[in-house]
């Protein structure tokens, strides 16, 4: 049975049809949402921008002394524009909107024209399609981040409990569950919220995936004396961790 989101089969490439058939044969868990195929294909419609180098903000005369770039722009369009860097990035750390009802805008025109300059309106908690809009926003960006990474590249993406599970499913689809390195949780507060009705969430998360876990290299930095000096001595004379 075909996914209800799959349509216009005659417009798909051979590779796309093979992908659909492979998933039908192999089965498994898949994230289903309205507009899935559009989200998977939309990056192809993004028009790259002309890059203008601001010499006043650049390091000296750009005479080979610096190999880094600071790009100001919408992230999906920026990644499409930087096509020559695909497959060359070691590490991507990203902090997308958490879909809190206050921090995420969506323009419905992006479903057909991702180049529309309007930011759209705030997606509120009362919006019944808020999760679908967020997934459609994120999916092409995750695809592009995957293509930007080196074979041994790493992605670290921040999120909280609102979209944690949807994000994890998207990353499993694009990167492969076998390439998940881990889930880091960090404590964002040390006291319960006064307005919480049930549980007071005190943590946020960082999902870490490798483009190819077998090629990825982590934990290569040994502890330094400076790191050790950040520990306090307890009554027994041993150094213990402390938190600011």
Residue positions per predicted region:
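Short, surface-exposed basic-aromatic patches at helix termini and helix-loop junctions that form
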Residues: 84-87, 169-177, 200-201
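SAM-dependent methyltransferase catalytic-core segment centered on the flexible catalytic loop
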Residues: 86-154, 162, 178, 203, ...
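Short, surface-exposed recognition loops and adjoining beta-strand edges that mediate ligand/DNA contacts
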Residues: 182-198
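DnaQ-like (DEDDh/DEDDy) 3′-5′ exonuclease domain used for proofreading
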Residues: 1-94, 98-140
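Structured core elements
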Residues: 70, 93, 156-158, 185, ...
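Conserved Class I S-adenosyl-L-methionine
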Residues: 165-187
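Core SAM-dependent methyltransferase catalytic element
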Residues: 199-215
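A short acidic (Asp/Glu
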Residues: 81-82, 166-170, 194-195
């Amino acid at each position: 049975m075909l996914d209800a989101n799959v349509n216009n089969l005659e417009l798909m490439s051979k590779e796309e049809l093979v992908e659909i058939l492979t998933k039908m044969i192999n089965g498994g868990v898949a994230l289903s949402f309205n507009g899935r195929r559009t989200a998977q294909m939309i990056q192809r419609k993004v028009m790259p921008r002309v890059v203008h180098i601001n010499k006043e903000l650049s390091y000296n005369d750009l005479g080979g002394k610096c190999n880094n770039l600071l790009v100001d722009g919408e992230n999906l369009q920026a990644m499409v524009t930087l096509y020559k860097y695909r497959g060359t990035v070691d590490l991507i750390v990203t902090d997308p909107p958490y879909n809190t009802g206050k921090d995420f805008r969506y323009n419905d025109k992006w479903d057909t024209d991702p180049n529309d300059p309007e930011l759209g309106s705030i997606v509120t908690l009362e919006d019944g399609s808020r999760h679908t809009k967020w997934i459609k926003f994120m999916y092409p960006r995750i695809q592009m981040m995957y293509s930007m990474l080196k074979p041994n590249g790493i992605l670290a993406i921040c999120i909280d409990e609102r979209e944690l599970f949807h994000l994890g499913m998207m990353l499993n689809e694009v990167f492969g569950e076998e390439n998940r390195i881990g889930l880091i949780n960090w404590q964002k507060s040390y006291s319960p919220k006064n307005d919480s009705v049930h549980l007071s969430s005190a943590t946020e998360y960082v999902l870490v995936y490798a483009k190819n876990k077998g090629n990825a290299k982590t934990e290569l930095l040994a502890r330094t004396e400076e790191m050790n000096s950040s520990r306090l001595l307890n009554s027994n004379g041993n150094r213990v961790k402390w938190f600011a």
